[in-house]
Amino acid sequence: MSSRWVEINCSLSLCRKVFAILKQKNPRQLPDKIDIIAYRENSRKCSIAKENKRLGMKDDDRDWVAHFDHPFLMTPHICIKQDFLFFPFDVPTRKKKYQGKAAPYWKYCIGNWILIEATVHELSHYVHIGHGKDFFKIYYKFLSQMAQVVISGEFYYWYSIQHQSTKR
């Protein structure tokens, strides 16, 4: 396995960890199972790839780094672009009035924080479709929970806590 895929798999495991933590904190708001996968152009799971292919469009859309799909009779999933998983660097979610304006360099986010933010954003779409007021309420709720978990240090030893609780 190339080092690029090692990085991508590490980022995917971090995103899955974010889902597991939020699922534990909000058991009724999130699904029991969700697949978090690296986006591939001709993926059978990704409905955006199917839709683009059906419409004759090329999968060259630069406007997104991740998207949430909940296809009929299938497990919901989040597809995240491979280059974003390899080098996580982007501007966090902004309200509509700030979109389209150039973001200053200090508003960019890199590393674990942007992976957490992107995962929280896509998980919020399970509860609310679109980017209205209700979406931002749930988005900020999930994001503040994750910030609290990271700042408290619980995020970094969360798997060991889960492992200990199953042994008892």
Positions of PLM-derived features:
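Walker B catalytic acidic pair
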Residues: 122
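Active-site-proximal or metal-binding-adjacent scaffold patches in catalytic folds
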Residues: 1-117, 126-168
